[in-house]
């Protein structure tokens, strides 16, 4: 397994992430996959600019929504890096399943392809995308219907991006959720990243907090 889960890369610089991508290829070919169609191309253009700032210029857009190209998707495994962008993870999950991306990502995970996932894209690789629903629903509602929102499950914990921007009341909901849903939640500040080499084990850079059964526990080892 070769996964990097981040809060906002490349919008916040992270040398460790850049180094891992460069280790995959000197001039990596990167598949940029958003949750839904980028109608005016603005998101892709901005992503290209940000990746260009760290000298990655071979960025290709893969649409899994309105302009789905199954032939293009069939060659996903040929990219050096697969990048799952930010966005609504509930919609991302729906489109990934509908387009067949979810199955292809599972294959890429099992074959050790490098996948970099940010924010909503990172949630797609966890067991469930229900953390996002806490923004608009109660803990009780989210837990009661959590079974309908299972995701790829490449890692065993759920991920909360942008924890440095969250209000205390929302963090309290996440702590309750971790207890009532019986799941670990790993919270990432902007600029942080997890480097997952197996379903349960990761190293990290930046500020990372782990919640378990409603409590804050120690995180795993820092990456070099």
Predicted regions located by residue number:
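Catalytic nucleophile loop
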Residues: 83-86, 109-128
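Catalytic-core regions built around general acid/base machinery
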Residues: 75, 99-112
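Glycine/threonine-rich flexible loop motifs
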Residues: 89-99
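Glycine/Thr-rich phosphate-binding loops of Rossmann-like dinucleotide-binding domains
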Residues: 13, 92-93, 126, 133
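N-terminal small/polar loop signature for handling phosphorylated ligands or for N-terminal nucleophile
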Residues: 70-81, 93
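C-terminal and late-domain segments of enzyme folds
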Residues: 1-26, 38-49, 81, 131, ...
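ATP/NTP phosphate-donor binding region
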Residues: 15-75
């Amino acid at each position: 397994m070769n996964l990097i889960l981040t809060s906002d890369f490349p919008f916040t610089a992270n040398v460790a992430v850049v180094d891992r991508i460069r280790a995959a290829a000197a001039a990596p070919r990167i598949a940029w996959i958003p949750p839904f169609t980028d109608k005016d191309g603005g998101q892709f253009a901005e992503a290209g600019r940000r990746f260009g700032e760290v000298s990655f210029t071979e960025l290709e857009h893969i649409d899994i929504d309105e302009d789905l190209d199954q032939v293009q998707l069939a060659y996903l495994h040929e990219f050096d890096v697969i990048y799952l962008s930010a966005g609504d993870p509930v919609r991302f999950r729906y489109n990934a399943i509908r387009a067949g991306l979810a199955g292809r990502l599972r294959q890429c995970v099992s074959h050790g392809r490098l996948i970099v996932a940010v924010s909503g894209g990172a949630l797609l690789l966890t067991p469930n995308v229900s953390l996002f629903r806490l923004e608009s629903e109660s803990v009780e509602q989210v837990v009661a219907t959590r079974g309908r929102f299972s995701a790829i499950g490449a890692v065993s914990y759920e991920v909360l991006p942008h924890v440095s921007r969250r209000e205390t009341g929302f963090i309290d909901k996440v702590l309750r959720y971790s207890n009532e849903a019986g799941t670990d939640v790993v919270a990432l500040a902007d600029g942080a990243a997890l480097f997952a080499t197996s379903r349960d084990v990761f190293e990290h850079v930046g500020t990372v907090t782990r919640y378990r059964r409603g409590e804050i526990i120690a995180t795993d080892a820092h990456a070099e």
